Regions:
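H/E-rich (His + Asp/Glu) clusters that bind or coordinate divalent metals
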Residues: 3-119
């Protein structure tokens, strides 16, 4: 579960092409059944790219608050590591999609978490 997908969102087309050249199934079939990406990205454009490239079902909420970058962004006046606000401000993200990112997807990845919390 790399932060923001690491370099994956930037190289997604390359990976798709490599899979095709190697006669592998499309990446959505090959990888996205068990590969997930978190939202621990410290700026809105990074989250927007992640949401544009990776299916919502493969994105998990994450925050290091208070974490690696505790300062306040002089451009926004907000803490860099307040990753929830990037999800809240994402363009075109429905309430249903937000719920998947915040809790629904992680319950699919870690089903015991949901059972433990319910008990």
């Amino acid at each position: 579960i790399p932060h923001g997908g690491g370099a994956v969102p930037y190289h997604w087309g390359r990976y798709r092409g490599l899979a095709q050249d190697m006669k592998r199934p499309p990446l959505k079939e090959l990888l996205l059944n068990n590969v997930f990406f978190d939202t621990c990205v410290y700026h809105q454009p990074g989250i927007e790219l992640l949401l544009k490239v990776i299916p919502i079902e493969n994105i998990l909420f994450a925050s290091e608050m208070v974490g690696a970058v505790r300062g306040i962004d002089p451009e926004t006046g907000q803490y860099f590591d307040d990753t929830k606000r990037y999800i809240e401000n994402a363009v075109g993200l429905s309430d249903t999609d937000k719920k998947k990112i915040y809790e629904g997807n992680v319950r699919k990845v870690y089903p015991r978490f949901g059972r433990r919390r319910a008990s």
